[in-house]
Amino acid sequence: MVGLQASGKSTWVAGHLAGTHVVVSKDHWPRARHREARQQRVVAELLAEGRSVVVDNTSPSVAERAPLIAIAAAACVPVRAVFLDVPLGTCRERNDARTGAARVPLVGLHAAAGRLVAPTTAEGFTEVTVVRAVGGEGVLPQAAGPEEERGRGTAAAAIPEGSIAQTCLRPGSAAQP
């Protein structure tokens, strides 16, 4: 997942992937030291077990996404970015409506906005899906028609098997398309 705080990432994950993917987020360990390293270790372990994983973090920059892309590549699995392209103003409004620990300090929201770079396949993603807000009210509905999907970039279905454009070699194995 890629998107600012309060863009709707967790909501999107809950509605689209929670039943089929293990959700991993640094937010699961708010007080832990080395949360980034822990997250990377957990993702690598889950992928090694053959599990499907979704990382629910802001992941705003190429540099912040690179370690997870490398982990997926090492596990010979496709990696898709779902980018919630929601305006900063909308994220601020949603964040202002949050209470307690769910509310992100504005400095954090603005810092992430300053680092935000839309993901591309050039980074190593197999696919990039863009999800946009509808009238500032949330992300596009899951059941959007084909024309809406093409025109607005709604969430795509899971990556089809065999869609990896590269050959993956594991030690002691034959090439896998």
Model-derived segments and their meaning:
Residues 1:
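Hydrophobic anchor at the beta1->P-loop junction of P-loop NTPases
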Residues 4:
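P-loop (Walker A) phosphate-binding loop of NTP-binding proteins
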Residues 7-64:
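Conserved substrate/cofactor phosphate-moiety recognition/catalytic segment
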Residues 14-15, 26, 46-49, 66, ...:
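Catalytic phosphate/metal-binding cores of nucleic-acid and nucleotide-processing enzymes, i.e., regions
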Residues 21, 49-51, 75-80, 123-127:
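Short glycine-/polar-rich loops that comprise or flank the Walker A/P-loop
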Residues 29, 61, 85-90, 135-137:
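Conserved nucleotide-binding/hydrolysis micro-motifs of P-loop NTPases
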Residues 75-94:
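Conserved phosphate-donor/acceptor-positioning beta-strand/loop module used by diverse small-molecule
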Residues 89-177:
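Conserved GTP-binding G-domain of TRAFAC-class P-loop NTPases and closely related GTPase folds
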